[in-house]
């Protein structure tokens, strides 16, 4: 069953169950039994406030299917919840190469680009951007277009992003990059693959 993505209202999944039950009944009336039902993904994550609900409502999600989905004996249900599981687990960490002050727009040019996280360039998706260095300095806020170093006009992570006053060498975190980040990265313009750190790696280094 193909369903849309980024759903946070669980009522939509109840409606999906109703529709699947109708389709199931159509098959039953013709003595056709499906081995499994794949309900896809769809469970959304919050790109705008990644710290408010870092873990999706899995318990309520599975409970809903368990209650409302009318399965045949032995029939399996498959879920594809990749984004909901890993999106909030990863951030793209980048360093500011230059700050360019324009007449109307200030730019923060970082060393990461569309080659590392293509979602903003590909379909203008939003990712929260944080200036970790500026937060530590408690600097005043300003607006920046945050762009990468790839020679493409689409190499932009965000326009008019409100950030602490930014300077060369500042460290940025581009949030919710755990899904569709590294897996969609490329070597375009001879860009090398960036190193990926996991919490397990850090724990090993401390041991």
What residues fall within each predicted segment?
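Acidic, glycine-rich loop-and-beta core segments that form the ion-binding/anion-interacting portion
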Residues: 14-79
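Short glycine/threonine-rich loop-to-helix capping motif typified by GTGT followed
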Residues: 9-16, 46-60, 87-98, 159-162
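Solvent-exposed, charged interface segments at domain starts and junctions
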Residues: 5-7, 103-104
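Active-site pocket-lining/capping segments in soluble small-molecule metabolic enzymes
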Residues: 6-19, 23-26, 111, 135
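Generic signature of intrinsically disordered, low-complexity segments enriched in small/polar residues
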Residues: 6, 16, 30, 50, ...
